[in-house]
Amino acid sequence: MFPESFQIYFSEHQNLLYLSTLVLDLGLTVLMFRFFGKEGLLACIVLSILLANLQGPKLTVIFSMQTSLGVIFYSSIFFATDLMSEKFGKKEADRAVMMGFSISVIILLMLSISLLFLPSIQGNQTFSTEVHQAFVTILDFTPRFIIGSLFSYLI
């Protein structure tokens, strides 16, 4: 998706990639609030919960510590919920987070149903099987992240 030079640079500068992604995520949250108000914050909260849960299984090393990529998006969840609470009240912020978790559960359910479909045996069977296995791998961890996130929020 990105030019090869871009990929090479950031593969050698993972800490800078982390900080850039964090600034981009928080910056987009601010822009969404500026352009769309409460609905923009709601969209950011839902999107960040989804991204945090889907990217949670991917581990990397940032500043010499192993970490999940999901942590990047938790910062914008906290930022957006704090902003929503400040501007629109705690009840609206709680409602937005619960909507995000509800959508995560719905997406997880629908993606899990997709795993019941067998990979195609027509055409490129190897590719179909590899894609199916990739879905299985990602979705195997996602319920744990959704449940853990929900419990940590409720506590």
Each language-model region and where it sits:
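Membrane-embedded alpha-helical bundles of multi-pass transporters/translocases
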Residues: D140-R144, G148, S152
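Membrane-interface interhelical connector segments
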Residues: S114-P143
